[in-house]
Amino acid sequence: MAVALLDDWCKGMDLDPKKAVLIVGIPVQYTEAAINDALKEGLPPLCAYKVIGRMFRREDEAKAVLIELPEVVDYTMMPTHIPAEGGAWEVVVKPRSPDDEFMNKLIYFLRDEGRRIVDVAKALGFSTVPTGKIELKNLDQDKPKGLKSLCNNSTCYKKLKVFSGSPFPGPGEESFETWLEEVTELMQLWQVSEREKKQCLLESLRGSALSIMQALWTSNDSLTVEQCLKALKHIFGNKEDSKVLQFRFLQSSQKPAEKVSDYLLRLEPLLQKAVQQSPLSAHSADSIRLKHVLSQVSMTTGLRGKLSLLDQQGCPPTFLELMKLTRDEEEWESTVVVEEQEQVRRDSSACEAANEVVTQAEDSREVSTQTTGEEMTSVKRRRLLWRHSAGEEGQRKESGFWAESEPDEQKPYVRAQESGNERGAWAVSHPNPKEIEAQDSQEFLPVAGNRDTLTKSWGSPDKGTGDMSVAEGQQGQGKAPNFLLARNDPNKQEQIPHSSVTTKWQDRGECQRLKWGASMITRPQGNPDRSWDTSGSQDGEDGCSELRMPTGTEAAQGVEEPATGLSWAEDTSAWEQARLGRETVPRRGGRRIQPVFRIIYTALGEPHEGSTLESFRE
């Protein structure tokens, strides 16, 4: 009800409801002076108001007062109640409208952008409609007055900054250079009449600058805005000499790590100032700019070649053309740099992959080296164990343990080692074959005597033997000497008992025995097969002979089976005892076989010696 009363009262008084305030609930006994005092205390201190009228309301049994404000009601500052004696008074205002708030924001926005409502209509697709026929809805009294003026008068512009002409600008003022740059730019953008531009220019001037501009227009009303700005520039502009401006331009240089395009943007204002103070044309300015860039700027070879060609042809590019050419070259250079960085990254990745492969190969090599070392250690360990066992076996053989405990057919066969058939013999020069043959004949010469004397003398295979002197004494006394196997060592003579030496003979066929010195040959009765060579040795001592071992099929058949054609079975044991002290020299045909030494290299081990006699002895 109070809002309806406010609308009716404003219509009767021709007032804007948004600029009016209705106060209800005032007691009847309050006089006009008391009401004014209460309003002064209750309303904001900066709020100017005027009491329009008073009335009595029957519904409330109280008075109502209508107040007019010079501006639209500020809802943030206006209170809702006014405290007084007898109770608070209610303040009634026009309710807010969302459309009004939107229109106010639109007005301020268009003013800041320098646009008009007509421009908004054209942007919305109403360009074909004449400007005079554009009608906005609800253009009645409840719309803001600013909106009406904006719609009726199409002038809308951005408020310019203030210039007073003082050498020291005050608060809210700008220097002449800054103000002139802004005004020149906005005047070129505004699509308004010349009169409106002049009006805006006058609003931005203060002090001495405003007085000078008014005097100019009074003297010549036909002056344009551009002419007025030139006049102000001559009056308030920089008074620098043209030579100083030219010197500044020529002394400008490129900063470290500064792009060519950035330097051109910094150089252009200096060039324009220098040209304005001198009678040079635009073509001369382009030529000066090009020559200065070629002499002062560090650039790529391609860009320098292009600019040098333009300079030689006498066709200097303008500022925009030079900027475009420079930007294109910088973009191409940045692309090349990115590609090079990508290539470097790929190369580094490939190097890392190769390093990983090499590292893996080294790791595997270390593992294989460790494995090989372990294998070598195991091989050496087995070899040492074998040598140790072989040494123990040799000691047992020398002590005669095996010869006493094992039967004759199971005893191991031990041969006397020849001279030079030991470790390291490969490093010694080969001796004379004839000397070797003579030594062999002396070492392995059989004991002289017949079977009876041998049987009586030796008795059993386990009987030990004496030294060489004892054997010679026994021979001189007619006794069968005990046979000694001597190792052909120039420094030491090592005696080997006959109990540890066994030889294997072919029992198939025949066997011959030679006497010492008398060349007496005793042949057993039986098959007269001549598989044995009875020729005496020409290289040995006189009266000595050699026994030839059957080869081929005969040797293969006679290794393990006893001969079935023996005619002296009763003397077999004695004859076997006699053979314990003999060492046969293998022969092939009529030639004596010389031992051939060779070095056998074993992987991851030491060289070993071998002899071709091993195959015959085995």
UniProtKB/Swiss-Prot annotation:
InterPro entries, per the entry: PNMA (IPR026523), PNMA_C (IPR048270), PNMA_N (IPR048271)
Alphabetized Pfam families for the sequence: PNMA, PNMA_N
Keyword Transcription regulation assigned: no
Tissue expression remark: Restricted to testis, where expression is low. Not detected in the brain.
Region (Disordered): 390-409, 451-475, 519-549
Domain of life: Eukaryota
Location(s), subcellular: Nucleus
Protein name: Paraneoplastic antigen-like protein 5
Gene: Pnma5
